[in-house]
């Protein structure tokens, strides 16, 4: 079981790195830094000399080669692929366990899910950053992180905090988890549609609290297949609708989190309330900085990573609340 615990913990750390690399790739507009998959302009890594670059551009004349965009894409791909290799080892050791448990099935499910993530990685490139595909791919990254974390919790002999006596904790923690998933989806949808700066001021949006918004086109999940979606194709009102929804959802999520934290604070689980509070405050601050300072790269990456930490924190509360 120790092997499972170590591998799953390493998986959590590696998945965290992959999420950061994915955010980096997206934020520097390198999603099509390699227009093919799994190679890069037909090379195992990426073209480096003049002859290789000339060959690469002859293969894909519609995609001029830019090494500054190829590097983030290739690095992200190889780190993501290493998650699959790690999941293979995890599944192998899980099936060797003599104890009766279902960790082996969770490990196998994780391996299958990572293979599906690879497929979505291919579709992300082949469909030229189609927003719904990119959104599902990024959401899958958070799911991969959570699955590794769940296996880590199941494999470890951790001292549990008794939260069973906290009234209505199951319901409140479940609502908080679902609300956070919705907020993460809205954040990812904002990013994949290049709507992060649709509202360039705060707390207003384009100088008003009720800007012009187009929800129909902003939340059209079935955008046309074929066009290149790099930099986004939505008009301003549609992007504003996406961005503003993410802001309003953040307010609602904060209220739900405050209720959850109040339940945890007056119990033996007070440290969990403190953790949630610190992460929530950090995330709100990073979100505001992203708008006010026009999406600084490392702040925007941090915004993604704190979202991942919030997900693990709320998942931990649910794990304790629903644990038999």
Regions found by a protein language model. Give the residues of each.
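N-terminal membrane topogenic signal
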Residues: 1-10, 324
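A juxtamembrane structural motif centered on a specific transmembrane helix
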Residues: 150-172, 312-324
